[in-house]
Amino acid sequence: MFYDQAKIYVKGGDGGAGAVAFRREKYVPEGGPSGGDGGRGGKVIFIADEGLRTLVDFRYKRHYKADRGEHGQGKNMHGKSGEDMSVRIPVGTVVKDADTGEILADLIEHGQKVVVANGGRGGRGNARFMSNTNKAPTVAENGEPGEERNLLLELKLLADVGLVGFPNVGKSTIISRISAAKPKIADYHFTTLVPNLGVVELEDGESFVVADIPGLIEGAHTGAGLGHEFLRHTERTRLILHVLDIAGSEERDPLEDFQIIAEELRQYSQELANRPILIVANKMDIPGAEENLQRLTEKLGEDYRIFPVSAATGEGLKELVYAAAKALPEIPAPQIFVRDEEQHKLTQASAPHRFELTREGDFFVVSGKEVEKHVQMTMFDREDGLYRFQNILKAMGIERALLDEGIKVGDKVRIAGIEFEWEE
């Protein structure tokens, strides 16, 4: 089975907690703080590997979690960072956030890497909190939780040329003739249910990769007949060979077939519909082909190059292959995804809302990535930790927002699942 989609969960390692410790030193209160920082959590990293062909491995393992950082220790000893987790995926995989649909990466080269989940930073030890007014702090931080997200992986085959058309028009026979690919061939619809790749080698030493895309039907752009799964693999091709049963042996009109598939490509992606196309008029060895070829040429000959061929006898295939090879250098490779790193950073930095305040029954509920991170990193079992958290709420404007909403002594506040009681 050819697995070209997978949904998985990834999580970076949590940061290690900072330590509360004091060294023994004469004339220094409590010996002076010496708690080290926690180590950073490991990252989850995807690496493109040309040796992998499908996403089948992700069918059996769906959760990937990097190691957490070690906790800090006394004597200003920092915790060791967690080990990164490297996950190999096939070249040609597009990585999406499954919850938002955002494209995170498009891995098209062997060895290309992308971090899909960062590890959390280590919590600061109490040595970091010493100041002129607090010579012996007893506060430290928990480690920051690692990033976590659900990912959708989509494998889009890397091919220069894509063979498209209705089922049973001869695409598999053509690819078996012009390359070493050995697809399953039979005289019934949907013989090909997975894409086949073949390398076409020319006499002058040049070569290109061709993909036999499983047969499309009307409504493919809506998913009919596994259309979405099949059309996905045409997105990377630079040149499309639209194969027609020019003899009409399936009692279909080849001109109408061309128009239907062209419309399916347009409905799926306008950029795909604009891709250069060569028309392959196959089955020229069957009676009725000449008449249909003449009619097709009259209708489409001015806009498209038409190549009459017979996959059964091999007639016309050499001319087709060399025409494709000649056209390819002039056609730029399509780009599925280009990430503007600077723009991405600016977007992240300019988030308009630092927190949100709502009411749920008797609770005031405060939510937001920043404040929730502070909750997770605060050691509430230490008085200094609670005092510091109160100062954070004040600095972020949360205290003022709660007062404006009419909070009173004894009211309940919930942040990141933890409940607090409001006091003066």
UniProtKB/Swiss-Prot annotation:
One term under GO cellular component: cytoplasm
Amino acids binding Mg(2+): 172, 192
Sequence ranges assigned to domain OCT in this UniProt record: 347-424
OBG-type G domain boundaries: 159-329
Cofactor annotation: Mg(2+)
Subunit (UniProt): Monomer.
Entry function: An essential GTPase which binds GTP, GDP and possibly (p)ppGpp with moderate affinity, with high nucleotide exchange rates and a fairly low GTP hydrolysis rate. Plays a role in control of the cell cycle, stress response, ribosome biogenesis and in those bacteria that undergo differentiation, in morphogenesis control.
Alphabetically ordered keywords of this record: Cytoplasm, GTP-binding, Hydrolase, Magnesium, Metal-binding, Nucleotide-binding
GO biological process: ribosome biogenesis
Pfam families for this protein: DUF1967 (PF09269), GTP1_OBG (PF01018), MMR_HSR1 (PF01926)
The protein's name in its UniProt record: GTPase Obg
Organism the protein comes from: Desulfitobacterium hafniense (strain DSM 10664 / DCB-2)
InterPro entries in the cross-refs: G_OBG, GTP-bd, GTP-bd_Obg/CgtA, GTP-bd_prot_GTP1/OBG_C_sf, GTP1-OBG_CS, GTP1_OBG_dom, GTP1_OBG_dom_sf, OBG_GTPase
PROSITE patterns attached to this UniProt entry: G_OBG, GTP1_OBG, OBG, OCT
E.C. number: 3.6.5.-
Binding positions (GTP): 165-172, 190-194, 212-215, 282-285, 310-312
